[in-house]
């Protein structure tokens, strides 16, 4: 066991390296492994890569075999630390982006010498609201651009309780973050005369509603971060990490539809930027897609947009031109650090599309962000000759406090919409207030 300084708890190491990787194999998922570049060293990274991915004949690979794992695990994607710019990190690189970039460069290079098939991700700023963004990222990338494959991004969009425009308009801020980071990468690519184009890994994201603190200390200074993470409380007690208590501590102040639409709006932003966002990880994972009362497990509303995007969001991402009524978002502040600028002209309909030519499938995904009324749409697909309209799937809640339970698991579930009509390559449909919609076409 050891102290987890960040979360002020004891970590008993009940699940170790081998246990985790073997579990990942059993459930059929690919692990994304983060190495320690705070208190850890380059040599530690070499050793863990050798233990994990080298076939045998060396100290570390033979130690793995001695522990009962003959074949290497073949972990493909490795992260060079986590949120290394954050003052909440142990041995943060906040004040030395060049130093972190040099270490990331040398570590990635060495790990790829151990196994040339792996890919690595370097940390960007852990939020677009960090005071040093994007300069910190630029200084990091200038030191490691040719050694890494991804830049890791994190952001949790926050809106005031009950403000659905703030919640669902959050996709615009996510896209600003993506486009800024991609532009930084492309600038460094040009500066380095490099043939390599870096991709983005948005490996922590979420959307939530919580009370806004507002701005207590005007300006973009680091006060709020230091106030939060430089607290030294002599009375704070360490507790044992206990997953069995996590269910009781889960926050579910709102119904199922709010987090479902919030996460879906971010996923649409990812789909629109599929040329650069190659990895996306919902932080809450199973905790968002399902719920439990300890005795039972059931699907939340968030499961359905995620599942439908995974099923139908295949092939090529298409840019969707949306013309119609819009709304404006006034600027607002969550706290001193997270200050959202004003946005103008955001369409009520948030949309993205996928075209799988090989499978003969065309799919439009759309959110009606208007909480007050239906939105009528006309979808022109006449350029896709030979494609026929298949169905309109819609997801909406009887009220925003509704949620699925074990006793009523289908309170919020997809239904086939009855309003859609096709005529000469144009589909008309009605999108209900605060609804998720999938319109499918096949050839």
Residue ranges and their predicted role:
Residues 1-158, 162, 179, 186:
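N-terminal catalytic cores of secreted or lumenal carbohydrate-active enzymes
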Residues 24, 48, 78, 151, ...:
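Conserved, mostly hydrophobic/aromatic
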Residues 39-43, 81, 85-89, 127-132, ...:
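Flexible loop/turn segments at secondary-structure boundaries
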Residues 48-52, 94-97, 135-141, 167-169, ...:
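Short secondary-structure boundary/capping segments
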Residues 146, 150-158, 167, 171-188, ...:
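Extended catalytic-interface subdomain
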Residues 163, 200-350, 359:
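Aromatic/acidic polysaccharide-binding cleft in carbohydrate-active enzymes
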Residues 344-386, 392-395, 434-440:
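Carbohydrate-binding surface patches
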Residues 385-427, 431:
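Acidic, Ser/Thr/Pro-rich beta/coil linker or hinge segments at domain junctions
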